[in-house]
Design a protein with these regions (language model features):
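Loop/turn-to-beta-strand initiation segments
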Residues: 36-38, 61-65, 90-93, 142-147
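A short beta-strand-to-loop transition that corresponds to the Sensor-1 phosphate-sensing loop
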Residues: 67-71, 148-153
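SF2 helicase catalytic motif II
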Residues: 62-128
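Short mixed-charge
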Residues: 2-35, 122-139
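Conserved catalytic network of the ASCE P-loop NTPase/AAA+ motor domain
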Residues: 31-33, 56-60, 84-88, 137-141
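Conserved helicase motor
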Residues: 39-49, 69-71
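Conserved motor-coupling elements within RecA-like helicase/translocase cores
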Residues: 28-34, 45-65
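Interdomain hinge/linker at the junction between the two RecA-like core domains of SF2 helicases
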Residues: 139-145, 154-169
């Protein structure tokens, strides 16, 4: 099995996979439910690369990041990881799927991720080819599109899309 399958695949022998519940519970908690998940995808004209750990050496080349809020928070708060914050500060599209499920978890983690994504790159090691001028001027959140998918409307989700964030025009 590939490293991607080993890290993110479903282990049928896992006791967590043997649990059963009502249909709505099964719909949310099927497959690999690890809440610290991160994938970096690099898209090039000639090839596509997938990295299980986008914070590793290839992170500066990841065009698409798929990660749980907890994975982003842990990476952003780890000491000596300013490069992670610099990388997250130039996110142009933020897609939050099953946001209603995230509301029932630790919503503060989601808010911290949004603040990390709204930050200004501060490191001289930031990839200047990827950082656009509005992001350097603390107006990156005005250039970012938020897509929030939820099964119901909630004030916290509306605030995520409607309210001005730090540095927003």
């Amino acid at each position: 099995a590939s490293r991607l399958e080993q890290e993110l695949g479903v282990d049928e022998d896992d006791p967590a996979m043997q649990r059963e519940g009502p249909p709505d519970w099964e719909a949310v908690f099927h497959g690999n439910i690890d809440d610290v998940c991160e994938i970096g995808i690099s898209v090039r004209v000639d090839r596509r690369d997938v990295s299980v750990d986008f914070f590793a050496g290839t992170r500066s080349r990841s065009d698409l990041i798929v990660a749980t809020p907890l994975a982003l928070r842990l990476a952003a708060e780890e000491e000596g990881r300013q490069g992670v914050l610099d990388r997250l500060s130039s996110v142009e599209v933020l897609l939050m799927d099953q946001a209603d499920v995230l509301l029932y978890q630790n919503w503060e983690t989601v808010e911290r991720c949004i603040r990390a994504v709204s930050g200004v790159p501060s490191s001289v090691e930031a990839d200047v080819q990827r950082v656009r001028l509005p992001f350097l001027d603390a107006h990156g959140s005005a250039c970012r599109q938020h897509i929030v998918l939820s099964s119901f409307n909630d004030a916290r989700l509306r605030a995520l899309v409607d309210r001005p964030l730090p540095g927003q025009l």
